[in-house]
Amino acid sequence: MRPLSYIKTMIVKKGIHKCTILTGAFSGLKMNLDFATQTQYYVGTHEKEVHYWLKRFSKDAMVAIDVGMDQGEYALYFLAKTNVKKVFGFEPNSLSLDFFTKNLILNHLENSNRLIVSSKFVNEVDSIESTTLDSLVFEIDNPIVIKIDVDGGEMDVLRGAKKLLAIPNVRLIIETHSPELEIECLNFLSDSGYKTKVIKNAWWRCILPEMRGAGHRKIQHNRWLVAAKKCGIDI
């Protein structure tokens, strides 16, 4: 066990706590957090590297799409801290959806008519259990901000979004889960006319790595990329 993790286990109470996020883009949002694995959410360092781009890309967005909501901090951000007219959220994990629902209630957003949530997987085909981002093409206005965090299915999501990605003024924030997928996503978006940028991990990640799951698992490859096309935002 790393020294910081050991100290944390000695001083932090076990279990789920209702918390208000202290700093960063999500500051002020309320979430149910397990400090055994989610202390970084609380202090505001979770995925800190993309906070700047999240704020920049969503500042004038009309629509936000959160693919892989998990417990919903990005969807909560779009609802509570931006003027987007519609938020589409996708999360197939029932436990994560349950946490998201509780987090909506904590933030008094459970009755928002701006939010549409689906439990379907997002990939390249429409079926009973899955859908594509292209299925939204006729329902949305631009500018559009899309966040994708799907634990290895990044290219499946992008291949099912070719029509959507052809719309002007689309901005993307994508977490990649292997060096090979990072390159594949960059090439796909570049070929689709997007300017892209890899967001390097902060220097302090060697001390505070991103963690995931009940087993407090260190993410072996955890980097983000951003992309935009015809939106007047320099990357």
Features from the language model and the residues they span:
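Short, conserved SAM-binding/catalytic segment
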Residues: 100-115
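Conserved SAM/SAH-binding beta-strand->alpha-helix loop
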Residues: 93
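Conserved active-site loop/cleft motifs that coordinate metal ions or position small ligands
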Residues: 171-175, 197-198
